[in-house]
């Protein structure tokens, strides 16, 4: 049991600093908000979590305003539990990504599992049925025993939660770098489907309407989890296990089904619904009231508790999982109680909506908190941080491009070594632990450019992906941010889809350090530039700052999650070559783009230099490839990313054990160049004339560089290796490194 301090003791001891409040913020609460009254223990705790970066985005809010968030396809953008995008037929796709980085270092299994649980609740709080999970993971060097343990437990946590709740984990990405050794990134994206009429909002309005607590009971787990996620790691951070929540996917499954039933069958009595996520009960309820311009009066005696003698501070700040808040029309309380009882879940009336604009809590007959509701939510402070260009950026800008030389005799060995690099090597050993087929909607499972799920009752499908190459952002945050969006769109296009919108997880260092804030705001400029050019507005997202360990920051890593629409399932395209005799086509020109590449990192052990990115060419090439796919001219498509052309060709040949015979006017090194905006396609010879005619109507560049063979040999200029040997290296590298 936590011992409450008196208001005077809080002021004198300054314990609020440990909870994340600054002296200035504490004085603002006391003098400006409470009119000179000292905040009590519960109130101080509530402000500490609600004014954390994790909850109020006080450092990043000005940056987020840069993003384009509207478009004809957008039904609901940032501000609700998740974004909503129209896909026609009175249907919409709902999606969002969340981070659970700090908890996943302290308790990797539970941190990753509850990250999945939280984002799933965000989706069904909108009224949507979750249909897919994707993850974007970053770890330290895999030759480190601690890293291997974290990789094993994080992937087990994601698999355990998703598999048990019955939602397929269909895609994602994994990368390794020294900067993540003490601060792994666990970003989870969830996608759902909904009929327009069932779309919900997280609001509490209508004086006298009831506030219901539904789901699991409240414990002491996760208290100050939001504050924990809003500061750097230090030497004692690994012991902060009380800030990590514990999940129960079977409870979440019941909660999901109960909430969907309320929304679909009792929508007329439901005013609003919201997940109890970061900052638990205080966050969900105060945000619902603030958005509606209401007040709330809550009786904490009614909060279901799984531990004894919990005090108001603990009940309000607990981040126990599998809990939701519902605002229900007055007079219909019993209907809600009866429905949740059917699922053996608590559904308890804990308060009511008021019109006084205050957030008032009672416990054992005593008022234990009384503050303006907007001061907890909408009126939380916003800071405009100083931005300063890091010294390394000017150094990279002034430097020459990195240009490796690879001899004919060395190119095959270089290729083999690249195949075994942890970031390039097959992640099959990870994604095979996930159930990617449950719900039976998965058409393209993990391993291709994007996952594809059919939309039942229509002829449509959804393509989805997560992407970010943080090395590019380290060299140039603006171009790197733009590339992250462009690569996500390339993956959607290569799967036959039209990109619709993005969600993001902005993983950066300490925003109070000018160089770190510059990385954040500059990356946002690049993301915005690509989103505008590619017509992919930002509809939801998450900010995770303070990703530093003992003062050392991670690489800037804005993970981009994207969903695209495939209008006709016949246009679904995968990356693998289909049959011998098909022509291999390279779309896009190749230049000497090695700065930040896998090749540079492998050969030199570092990344340096300046990068180029032509967004206009990217858009032209994407439009051309999508048109060729929808015209039925393409048998396979694969985007070029890490490792360049040689790796993309190999990955295209692997699935069906085919060979390739490629002659292309590139140097040995250029086979591994990472020039953006490129695709590898295969087409039937009988479609070549139609393909070339379509090319004349576009300004895209394209050339036939070879053909698919059945001899089991990968031959690219002077590079030659058997497909079987290459597959063995590619699929065996990660399992071997994990031993």
Curated annotation (Swiss-Prot):
Part of the phosphoribosylformylglycinamidine synthase complex involved in the purines biosynthetic pathway. Catalyzes the ATP-dependent conversion of formylglycinamide ribonucleotide (FGAR) and glutamine to yield formylglycinamidine ribonucleotide (FGAM) and glutamate. The FGAM synthase complex is composed of three subunits. PurQ produces an ammonia molecule by converting glutamine to glutamate. PurL transfers the ammonia molecule to FGAR to form FGAM in an ATP-dependent manner. InterPro entries: PRibForGlyAmidine_synth_PurL, PurL_linker, PurM-like_C_dom, PurM-like_C_sf, PurM-like_N, PurM-like_N_sf. Mg(2+) 1 binds at residues 98, 542. It comes from Lactococcus lactis subsp. cremoris (strain SK11). ATP binds at residues 57, 96, 504, 541. One of its GO terms (biological process) is 'de novo' IMP biosynthetic process. Substrate binds at residues 99-102, 121, 245, 319-321, 544. Belongs to the FGAMS family. The active site is at residues 54, 100. Pathway: Purine metabolism; IMP biosynthesis via de novo pathway; 5-amino-1-(5-phospho-D-ribosyl)imidazole from N(2)-formyl-N(1)-(5-phospho-D-ribosyl)glycinamide: step 1/2. This is Phosphoribosylformylglycinamidine synthase subunit PurL. Its EC number is 6.3.5.3. It is found in: Cytoplasm. It catalyses: N(2)-formyl-N(1)-(5-phospho-beta-D-ribosyl)glycinamide + L-glutamine + ATP + H2O = 2-formamido-N(1)-(5-O-phospho-beta-D-ribosyl)acetamidine + L-glutamate + ADP + phosphate + H(+). Mg(2+) 2 binds at residues 122, 275. GO terms for cellular component: cytoplasm. Monomer. Part of the FGAM synthase complex composed of 1 PurL, 1 PurQ and 2 PurS subunits. GO terms for molecular function: ATP binding; magnesium ion binding; phosphoribosylformylglycinamidine synthase activity. It holds the Pfam family AIRS_C.
């Amino acid at each position: 049991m936590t011992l409450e301090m008196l208001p005077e003791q809080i002021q004198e001891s300054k314990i609020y600093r440990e909870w994340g409040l600054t002296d200035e913020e504490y004085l603002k609460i006391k003098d400006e908000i409470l009119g000179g009254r000292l905040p009590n223990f519960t109130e101080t705790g509530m402000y500490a979590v609600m004014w954390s970066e994790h909850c109020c985005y006080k450092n990043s809010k000005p940056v987020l305003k840069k993003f384009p968030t509207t478009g004809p396809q957008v039904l609901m953008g940032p501000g609700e539990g998740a974004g909503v995008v129209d896909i026609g037929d009175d249907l919409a796709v709902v999606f969002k990504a969340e981070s659970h980085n700090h908890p996943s270092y302290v308790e990797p299994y539970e941190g990753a599992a509850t990250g999945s649980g939280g984002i799933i609740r965000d989706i069904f709080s909108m009224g949507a049925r979750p249909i897919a999970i994707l993850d974007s993971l970053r770890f330290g060097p895999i030759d480190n025993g601690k890293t291997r343990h974290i990789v094993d437990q994080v992937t087990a946590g994601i698999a355990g939660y998703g598999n048990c709740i019955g939602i397929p984990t269909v895609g994602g990405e994994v990368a390794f770098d020294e900067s993540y050794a003490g601060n792994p990134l666990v970003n989870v994206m969830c996608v759902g489907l909904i009929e327009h009429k069932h779309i919900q909002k997280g609001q509490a309005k209508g004086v006298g309407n009831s506030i219901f607590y539904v789901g699991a009971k409240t414990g002491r787990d996760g208290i100050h989890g939001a504050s924990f996620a809003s500061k750097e790691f230090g030497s004692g951070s690994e012991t902060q296990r009380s800030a990590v929540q514990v999940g129960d996917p079977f409870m979440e499954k019941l909660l999901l089904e109960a909430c969907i039933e309320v929304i679909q069958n009792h929508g007329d009595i439901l005013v609003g619904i919201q997940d109890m996520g970061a900052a638990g009960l205080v966050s969900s309820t105060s945000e619902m009231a603030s958005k509606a311009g209401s007040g709330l009066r809550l009786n904490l005696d009614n909060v279901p508790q799984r531990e004894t003698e919990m005090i108001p501070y603990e009940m309000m700040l607990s981040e126990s999982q599998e809990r939701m808040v519902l605002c229900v029309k007055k007079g219909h309380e019993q209907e809600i109680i009866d429905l949740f009882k059917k699922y053996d879940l608590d559904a308890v009336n804990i308060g009511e909506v008021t019109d006084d604009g205050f957030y008032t809590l009672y416990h054992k007959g005593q008022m234990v908190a009384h503050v303006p509701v907007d001061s907890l939510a909408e009126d939380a402070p916003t800071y405009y941080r100083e931005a300063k260009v890091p010294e390394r950026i000017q150094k990279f800008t002034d430097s020459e491009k990195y240009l490796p030389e690879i001899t004919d005799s060395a190119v095959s060995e270089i290729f083999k070594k690249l195949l075994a690099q942890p970031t390039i090597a097959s992640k099959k050993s990870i994604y095979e632990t996930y159930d990617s087929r449950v719900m039976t909607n998965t058409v393209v499972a993990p391993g291709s450019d994007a996952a594809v799920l059919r939309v039942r009752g229509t002829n449509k499908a959804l393509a989805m992906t997560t992407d970010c190459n943080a090395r590019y952002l380290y060299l140039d945050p603006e171009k790197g941010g733009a590339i992250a969006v462009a690569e996500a769109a390339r993956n959607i296009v290569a799967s036959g889809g039209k990109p619709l919108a993005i969600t993001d997880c902005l993983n950066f260092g300490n925003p109070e350090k000018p160089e770190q804030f510059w990385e954040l705001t500059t990356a946002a400029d690049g993301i915005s530039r690509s989103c505008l050019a590619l017509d992919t507005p930002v509809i939801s997202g998450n900010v995770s700052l303070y990703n530093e360990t003992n003062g050392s920051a991670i690489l800037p890593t804005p993970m981009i999650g994207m969903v695209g629409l495939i209008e006709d399932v016949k246009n679904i395209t995968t990356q693998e070559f289909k049959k011998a005799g098909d022509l291999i086509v390279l779309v896009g020109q190749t230049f000497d783009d090695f700065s930040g590449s896998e090749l540079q990192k492998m050969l030199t052990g570092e990344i340096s230099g300046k990068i180029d990115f032509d967004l206009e060419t990217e858009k032209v090439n994407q439009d051309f490839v999508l048109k060729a796919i929808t015209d039925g001219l393409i048998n396979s498509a694969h985007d070029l990313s890490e490792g360049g052309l040689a790796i993309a060709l190999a990955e295209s040949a692997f699935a069906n054990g085919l060979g390739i015979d490629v002659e292309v006017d590139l140097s040995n090194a250029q086979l591994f160049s990472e020039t953006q905006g490129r695709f590898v396609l295969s087409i039937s010879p009988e479609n070549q004339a139609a393909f070339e005619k379509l090319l004349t109507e576009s300004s895209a560049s394209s050339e036939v560089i070879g053909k698919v063979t059945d001899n089991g040999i990968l031959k690219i200029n002077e590079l030659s290796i058997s497909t079987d040997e290459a597959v063995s290296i590619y699929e065996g590298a990660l399992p071997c490194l994990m031993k």
